[in-house]
């Protein structure tokens, strides 16, 4: 007796069933068709990508993803979540009458490729370009509808020419606070030359511009330029051989990449004066359609606070502090400066003053020794570590005393690592009775405290008896009077206003606004990044390259790695890879400034990996323009301000929430500079932001804590085993190193791309993280099989639809689905859209018999944004020769969307006595009549009188008896 394979027998009986093989053939064929026809090419209003006026005349929609870094590992199924979502949304927008721009480039500069090059000897460009090609293949297989003419990589010289050009616009600009905008630096020079603006001197006097040397002029302009080089404390990572921005350092003071120790070092670095835009970056958040959580992160990062600057005299120098509580000045009993404060050396005496407490000295013989030792200690901590609420407060007395400007008292001056040079002025007045950190510091160093805000509890006004500081605004000021001013009895708000006015009148301070935001550290000691278009003359003055010399291409070097050091050796400094190519570094150039050929030295730092992503939305608009950053008409068309979008920008930008204070803030800054200078009409880059969740996966670890291959783990009785050993399971990230990565290639091979697309969109709300389950993918595959069967005979391959009119029940199901799916796709609720499609498809399947053509065609159009390949195939089988991509999305007939009947509950004394099927449009008067006439209601009343009838048509009648 022979045995048969049921699956094989089934395929023989149904040779035209939708299978993985059929899906693969369909998908490859339609992807080729889309490429050949330019299906997703969005026309510009002008230029080389101009297209048909009819399409350009449609309302536009610019949809963007945060573009990927081309990793050597390729994509796992978590990566395409956002790409599929934007593709579904873009397809829906095309079908609802929009000219849709949707494309994808590659963010290709950065440390990973450089590290790979160091390890393998492969040039970063070679490995990066290979990774890009691999990723393009993976992305194409997903059926993403991108305009491929607009794609690029940030490593393309034609692209980074304009990154360099933008840098030069920023370098050659200054922020005019009166005009509240950036202006060309040439206009500032003209003001200096004419005498309209004075050139300040350190002693407060002024000088004429003509009296300044070239170096002095460069120094003056450096104080104004929006891109400038300066010596400043930076985060130096010897293990990486480069400096890091604050955002690239973890909370425990280590590098985000590589987990190396990070130290504070003083180095000359390029910075972007993003702080000039702090107010606008804050204020313009209100016009953006962004998640409130992201807005809050940006607001907190910018950190606007109102207060006063106050001068404390120390040995003939004025040390300025910023405080948000000038009303507590009488309570300032000591000062604390950042260890790096430049005035510390000036007022540190040779010996300890008489009577210095031992606890203040740190055990050192002299103030200079104490200061030097503490500075070295502080340099080993990151800003995050320094500001952490550590139990033990550290610091050291400088040996100097300052004068409290309101009380005239002498207060000791300390340095401590919890004060940062980059925030405020790098100095604070300490009011320990009313600040938690100051209180802890005062207790640790046996410093005096004075209560100047009356506690609202019963602790009294002697801080020496308190367990903690009293920090409240809802109280009155006490112990705050001198011969010249008294704040006693005032509320906090009134006291702040009075003391600020007094400080300004006396020339001791002024009201001001401070920001937590710091200028953006913009240089890296790496090879694989954009070269700076800057050269230095023999006097060390920085000069911009003329536009004709752009792009300044990255040269070949034999060794790509920055010089790295012992990760724990703080006494090191950077050596850049580019500095080793002397033929490239030392050049003779004619910069067109009238001086003729001169010898110069190129800048050997490179730009950070954020540079290329600060403006890429603009390059998508006009990707082949070699004369302008972007054609103004094209930028205005796609990104210009319009109703509901007063600052312009991309219509939808989808990406991870982890970029809240890095890429998103930097891109906003660049856009505002370009807007101010008249290069673009959009003051904001991204109008609407959507953060997708994360696709998670289970990580399995053995007894050593080492990840084991998830695919080889077995489940038995609720426990998990790998090669017979019990392992732990924890939900986390998906990745190659965690041995739990599933590639889209695997799923596409087993089920097809449309199934993968549906599964990722159906897993849950797009903005919520969710666990991957390969076993559940088959559910969406079966949905597509049922869809196929509703149109195609599996045995013959013939189309089975009929031209008959659908019945009432089918029409209602169809139009409810159309209405719901349309709303869900517009709102990016893709999981519920798929649920509605599934419900309609299942109803048609259960009904049996052939599906009416009008219903089948509408169903295919509903599916098209979600599963475009099978939709194209079925659309073609239904007799249409044109692509489904530009068909009109179905519109629901309101008559069929409203339920034919709804259930009305009738209550007597709050208890349900009857349920009635009534029209949803029934009036309250009619519903009351129907309810009172119902036999069950009549029986329940039993002849009792009715005091009141409460009607809420069409769903409730409540009868109150007499």
UniProtKB/Swiss-Prot annotation:
Motif mapping: 'HIGH' region: 68-79
Polar residues bias (residue ranges): 570-579
Binding site for ATP: 736
Catalysed transformations (reactions): tRNA(Leu) + L-leucine + ATP = L-leucyl-tRNA(Leu) + AMP + diphosphate
This protein's UniProt keywords: Aminoacyl-tRNA synthetase, ATP-binding, Cytoplasm, Ligase, Nucleotide-binding, Protein biosynthesis
Pfam families: Anticodon_1, tRNA-synt_1_2, tRNA-synt_1g
Record-level Gene Ontology MF annotations: aminoacyl-tRNA deacylase activity; ATP binding; leucine-tRNA ligase activity
GO biological process: leucyl-tRNA aminoacylation
Residues in coiled coil: none
InterPro entries xref list: aa-tRNA-synth_I_CS, Leu-tRNA-ligase, Leu_tRNA-synth_edit, M/V/L/I-tRNA-synth_anticd-bd, Methionyl/Leucyl_tRNA_Synth, Rossmann-like_a/b/a_fold, tRNAsynth_Ia_anticodon-bd, Val/Leu/Ile-tRNA-synth_edit
Motif 'KMSKS' region per UniProt: ranges: 733-737
EC number from the UniProt entry: 6.1.1.4
CDD domains: Anticodon_Ia_Leu_BEm
PROSITE patterns assigned to the protein according to its UniProt record, in alphabetical order: AA_TRNA_LIGASE_I
Domain of life: Bacteria
Ranges for region Disordered: 559-582
One GO CC term, this protein: cytosol
Subcellular location: Cytoplasm
Family: Belongs to the class-I aminoacyl-tRNA synthetase family.
Name of the molecule in the record: Leucine--tRNA ligase
Naturally occurring in which organism (per UniProt): Streptomyces avermitilis (strain ATCC 31267 / DSM 46492 / JCM 5070 / NBRC 14893 / NCIMB 12804 / NRRL 8165 / MA-4680)
Gene: leuS
């Amino acid at each position: 007796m022979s045995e048969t394979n049921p699956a094989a027998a089934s395929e023989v009986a149904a040779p035209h069933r939708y299978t993985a093989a059929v899906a693969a053939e369909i998908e490859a064929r339609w992807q080729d068709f889309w490429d050949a026809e330019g299906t997703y090419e969005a026309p510009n209003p002008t230029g080389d990508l101009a297209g048909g006026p009819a399409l350009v005349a449609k309302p536009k929609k610019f949809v963007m993803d945060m573009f990927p870094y081309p990793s050597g590992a390729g994509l796992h199924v978590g990566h395409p979540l956002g790409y599929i979502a934007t593709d579904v949304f873009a397809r829906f927008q095309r079908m609802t009458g929009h000219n849709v721009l949707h494309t994808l480039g590659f963010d290709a500069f950065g440390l990973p490729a450089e590290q790979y090059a160091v390890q393998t000897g492969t040039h970063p460009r070679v490995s990066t370009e290979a990774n890009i090609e691999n990723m393009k293949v993976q992305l194409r297989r997903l059926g993403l509808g991108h305009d491929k003419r607009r794609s690029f990589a940030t490593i393309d010289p034609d692209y980074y020419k304009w990154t360099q050009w933008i840098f030069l616009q920023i370098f050659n600009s200054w922020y005019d606070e009166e005009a509240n905008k950036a202006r060309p630096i040439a206009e500032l020079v003209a003001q200096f030359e004419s005498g309209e603006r004075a050139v300040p001197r350190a002693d407060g006097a002024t000088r004429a511009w003509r009296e300044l040397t070239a170096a002095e002029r460069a120094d003056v302009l450096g104080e104004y330029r929006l891109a400038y080089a300066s010596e400043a404390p930076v985060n130096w990572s010897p293990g990486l051989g480069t400096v890091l921005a604050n955002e690239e350092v973890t909370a425990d003071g280590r590098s985000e990449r590589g987990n190396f120790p990070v130290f504070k070092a003083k180095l000359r670095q390029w910075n972007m004066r993003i702080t000039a835009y702090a107010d606008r970056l804050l204020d313009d958040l209100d016009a953006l359609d962004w998640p409130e959580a992201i807005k809050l992160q940006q607001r907190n990062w910018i950190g606007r606070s109102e207060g006063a600057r106050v001068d404390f005299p120390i040995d003939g120098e004025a040390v300025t502090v910023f405080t948000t509580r000038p009303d507590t000045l009488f309570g300032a009993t000591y000062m604390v400066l950042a260890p790096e404060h430049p005035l510390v050396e000036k007022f540190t005496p040779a010996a300890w003053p008489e009577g210095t407490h031992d606890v203040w000295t740190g055990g050192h013989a002299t103030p200079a020794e104490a200061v030097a030792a503490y500075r070295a200690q502080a340099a080993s901590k990151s800003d995050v570590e320094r500001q952490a609420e550590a139990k033990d407060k550290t610091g050291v007395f400088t040996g100097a005393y300052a004068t409290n400007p309101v009380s005239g008292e002498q207060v000791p001056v300390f340095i401590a690592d919890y004060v940062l040079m980059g925030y405020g002025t790098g100095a604070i007045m300490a009011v320990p009775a009313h600040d938690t950190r100051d209180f802890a510091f005062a207790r640790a160093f046996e410093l005096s405290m004075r209560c100047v805000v009356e506690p609202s509890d019963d602790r009294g006004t002697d801080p020496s008896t308190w367990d903690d500081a009293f920090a409240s605004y809802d109280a009155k000021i006490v112990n705050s009077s001198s011969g010249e001013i008294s704040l006693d009895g005032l509320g906090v708000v009134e006291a702040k206003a009075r003391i600020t006015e007094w400080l300004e009148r006396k020339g001791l301070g002024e009201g001001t606004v401070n920001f937590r935001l710091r200028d953006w550290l913009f240089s890296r000691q790496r090879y694989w990044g954009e070269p700076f278009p800057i050269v230095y003359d023999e006097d060390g003055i920085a000069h911009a390259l003329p536009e004709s010399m752009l792009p300044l291409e990255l040269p070949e070097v034999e060794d790509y790695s920055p010089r790295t050091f012992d990760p724990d050796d703080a006494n090191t400094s950077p050596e850049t890879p580019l500095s080793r190519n002397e033929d490239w570094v030392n050049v003779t150039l004619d910069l067109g400034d009238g001086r003729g050929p001169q010898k110069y030295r190129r800048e050997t730092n490179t730009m950070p990996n954020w540079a290329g992503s600060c403006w890429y939305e603009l390059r998508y608009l006009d990707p082949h323009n070699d004369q302008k950053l972007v054609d103004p008409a094209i930028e205005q068309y796609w990104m210009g301000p319009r109703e509901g979008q007063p600052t312009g920008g991309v219509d939808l930008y989808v990406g991870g929430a982890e970029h809240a204070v890095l890429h998103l803030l930097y891109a906003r800054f660049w856009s505002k500079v370009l807007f101010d200078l008249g290069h673009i009409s959009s003051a904001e880059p991204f109008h609407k932001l959507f953060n997708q969740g994360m696709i998670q996966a289970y990580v399995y670890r053995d007894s050593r804590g080492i990840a084991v291959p998830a695919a080889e783990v077995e489940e038995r009785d609720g426990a998990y085993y790998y090669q017979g050993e019990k392992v732990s399971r924890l939900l986390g990230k998906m990745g190659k190193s965690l041995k739990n990565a599933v590639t889209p290639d695997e799923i596409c091979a087993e089920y097809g791309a449309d199934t993968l697309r549906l599964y990722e969109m159906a897993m849950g709300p797009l903005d919520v993280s969710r666990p991957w389950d390969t076993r559940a993918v088959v559910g969406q595959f079966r949905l597509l099989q049922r869809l196929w069967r509703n149109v195609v005979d599996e045995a013959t391959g013939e189309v089975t639809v009929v031209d008959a009119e659908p019945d009432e029940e089918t029409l209602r199901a169809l139009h409810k689905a159309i209405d719901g799916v349309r709303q869900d796709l517009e709102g990016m609720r893709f999981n519920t859209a798929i649920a509605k499609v599934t419900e309609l498809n299942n109803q048609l399947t259960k009904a049996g018999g052939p599906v009416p053509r009008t219903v089948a065609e509408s169903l295919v159009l509903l599916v098209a944004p979600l599963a475009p390949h099978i939709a194209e195939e079925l659309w073609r089988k239904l007799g249409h020769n044109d692509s489904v991509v530009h068909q009109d999305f179905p519109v629901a007939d309101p008559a069929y969307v409203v339920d034919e009947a709804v259930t009305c509950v009738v209550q007597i004394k709050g208890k349900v006595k009857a349920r009635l099927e009534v029209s949803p449009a029934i009036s309250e008067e009619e519903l009351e009549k129907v309810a009172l006439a119902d036999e069950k209601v009549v029986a329940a009343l039993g002849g009792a009188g009715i005091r009141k009838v409460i009607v809420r048509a069409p769903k409730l009648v409540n009868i109150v008896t007499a």
